[in-house]
């Protein structure tokens, strides 16, 4: 039995890319990279980073810390977070804990005392400084919705 394959593949040849790529290499200008406080991952336009790990390993915490730090360091950056497991409020609770130095449980259960006031105020002010450039995707969690949200 012979199979006939048809393809609708879209591609570009190396020849077609070479001249523009060579000029780009020779200009010596590197890509735009948004700074944050961790050595990895690199956050830049068109750069996709895939992070994997066991449940509870800290993937969400790491990514949110990178996103928040990049937002804090680049006033023109906007971020869209798509998380199917945690609510926006829970994600912000975690960042408030990290930024304020308060225990996550204290924030989660809202068990504040007078001794928490200064750190809570400082953490909230930090979150408020970038929250207007942070958005959370709502279902459906598909690429079409991501694209529409990015254009909004």
What is the meaning of each model-derived region?
Residues 1-2, 146:
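Generic low-polarity alpha-helical segments
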Residues 2-102:
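The Walker A/P-loop phosphate-binding site
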Residues 35-40, 69, 73-152:
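Cytosolic-facing regulatory segments adjacent to core modules
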